[in-house]
Amino acid sequence: MYPVDLHMHTVASTHAYSTLHDYIAEAQQKNIRLFAITDHGPDMADAPHYWHFMNMRVWPRLVDGVGILRGIEANIKNIEGDIDCTGPMLDQVDVIIAGFHEPVFPPQDKDTHTAAMIATMARGDAHIISHPGNPKYPVDIRAIAEAAAKYNVALELNNSSFMHSRKGSEPNCRAIAEAVRDAGGLLSLGSDSHIAFSLGDFTHCERILQEVNFPQDQILNVSPRRVLDFLEQRGMPAIAELANL
C-alpha cells in the first residue's frame, strides 16, 4: 500500500459518487497520508464550474492527519498542448494532471496524440499525464517517456484502466512503465477513484511495477514528502501545513 493517491474524483464531477468528507474518512481507515482531489477540467460536459476550482482555497490543508492537495484533471485540448486550466485557476491548484478525454479531444492518430501529449508537457503547467496507456489514444511510448523525463513530468499508471475503464490498456501500461524506467523518469500512481471505497487501490499498478522491476525511487507515491518535493521542484509554492506529513 502506497500512502499517497494522486487521482480521484468527487461528486463535483457528476459521474462520481463521493464527497471530500468520504475520502477523508476512507484515507484514515487505509492510512493514506496524502491525496489529491482532481475533478475534471471545465471543458468536460459534467465537470465542475470554473468557480469550483477558484474556490478550492476554502479547503483545509490537513484534516486529522490527512493531507489534501487541491488538484484538477485538466483536458488536453489540441495538438498545441493547450489545457483547460489557465489564468487565475493556475494560482488555486497544487497539482495539475492533464489527459485526453473523448468529449474534448476526439481520438485521432498516433502522431497527433504523441505531438499533443509532448506539447502539453513542454508548455510547463501539467505535472502528471493521466492514463497515457489508453488504447483509444495510441502514442509513441518511447518518445513520451523521454519527453516526460526531459520536462520532469510524471506519467501515470492508472489502476482504473485495468478494471472499469479504457479496456485494453494493460499492454500499453506495461510498456510505459518499462520506458519510464529506462528513461529515468517518474511514475505517478492514481486510483482514478470515482467512489471513495477505491481510494488508494493500486493492486493492478503494483503488479505491473513488480513485473517490470520498476525502481521505487522513480515512483512519486512512495511518500508525501516525495510528492511535495516534486511539486516544489516544478515551481509550486511550498505548503507549510503539510511540511510534517
From Swiss-Prot:
Cofactor note: Binds 3 Zn(2+) ions per subunit.
Molecular function terms, GO-annotated: phosphatase activity; zinc ion binding
A GO cellular component annotation in the UniProt record: cytosol
GO BP, sorted A to Z: bacterial-type flagellum-dependent swarming motility
Residues that hold Zn(2+) 1 according to the record: H7, H9, E73, D192
Entry binding sites for Zn(2+) 3: E73, H101, H131
Record keywords, A-Z: Hydrolase, Metal-binding, Zinc
Alphabetized Pfam families for the sequence: PHP
Enzymatic class: hydrolase
Binding site for Zn(2+) 2: H15, H40, H194
Subunit note: Homotrimer.
Designated name of the protein: Probable phosphatase PC1_1798
Protein's organism: Pectobacterium carotovorum subsp. carotovorum (strain PC1)
